[in-house]
Design a protein with these regions (language model features):
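Conserved SAM-binding loop
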Residues: 135-136
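Conserved SAM-binding strand-loop segment of SAM-dependent methyltransferases
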Residues: 141-153
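Conserved SAM/SAH-binding beta-strand->alpha-helix loop
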Residues: 128-130
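Class I SAM-dependent methyltransferase Rossmann-like catalytic core
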Residues: 64-81
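N-terminal auxiliary segments of SAM/dcSAM-dependent transferases
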Residues: 2-60
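Conserved SAM-binding loop of SAM-dependent methyltransferases across substrates and taxa
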Residues: 106-118
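Conserved class I S-adenosyl-L-methionine
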Residues: 95-105
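A short acidic, Gly/Pro-enriched loop at the edge of an enzyme's catalytic core
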Residues: 152-162
Length: 162
């Protein structure tokens, strides 16, 4: 891995589990984009996420205000019990190294779980660009790999996640 990459880029250098959502070829990090051999390119946004579904229009049900409100509720601890159960499952799953959060919303669970399990690699997807922006902006250590993606057709290679 190129150690000269900025931290928010470096975490995507090992994102070998992903396939181009257009042609299903392997994606590799080239400068500040994930690219395939067929020249499809997906840029790293300034907030630290990659949009692998640029053709998808965001639903009005998934607006920024909705996710900001949800983030406040989650941060207030109303769903702490769920977080603790999932964290315990990860603690008991020693062989699970690569974790996929599908429908990550504003990133509460991925962010908190990564803080508790820094030895694991977290990939988090949501179809809402607004929610992924909130997630990426609220993470300071660039440890979670954030993606906008079509949850019905995730661009992930078979058997690449635990």
């Amino acid at each position: 891995m190129n150690t000269n990459l900025k931290p928010k880029l470096q975490r995507f250098a090992s994102a070998t589990a992903f396939a181009c959502p257009i042609c299903q070829e392997n994606l590799t990090l080239v400068e500040s984009s994930l690219k395939c051999n067929n020249r499809h390119s997906f840029d790293l946004a300034k907030f630290g996420y990659v949009n692998l579904a640029p053709q998808i229009k965001q639903s009005a049900n998934y607006d920024k205000e909705n996710f900001q409100n949800r983030q406040q509720i989650l941060e207030a601890g109303f769903y702490q019990a769920i977080l603790e159960v999932v964290s315990d499952l990860l603690s008991n799953s020693k062989n699970a190294k690569t974790i996929l959060d599908i429908g990550c919303g504003e990133g509460f669970y991925s962010r908190k779980l990564q803080e508790s399990h820094p030895e694991k690699t977290f990939y988090a997807f949501d179809i809402s660009k607004d929610s992924v922006q909130i997630a990426a902006k609220s993470e300071s250590n660039w440890a979670v790999n954030w993606f906008v993606g079509d949850l019905a057709r995730l661009p992930i290679k078979d058997a690449s996640m635990d």
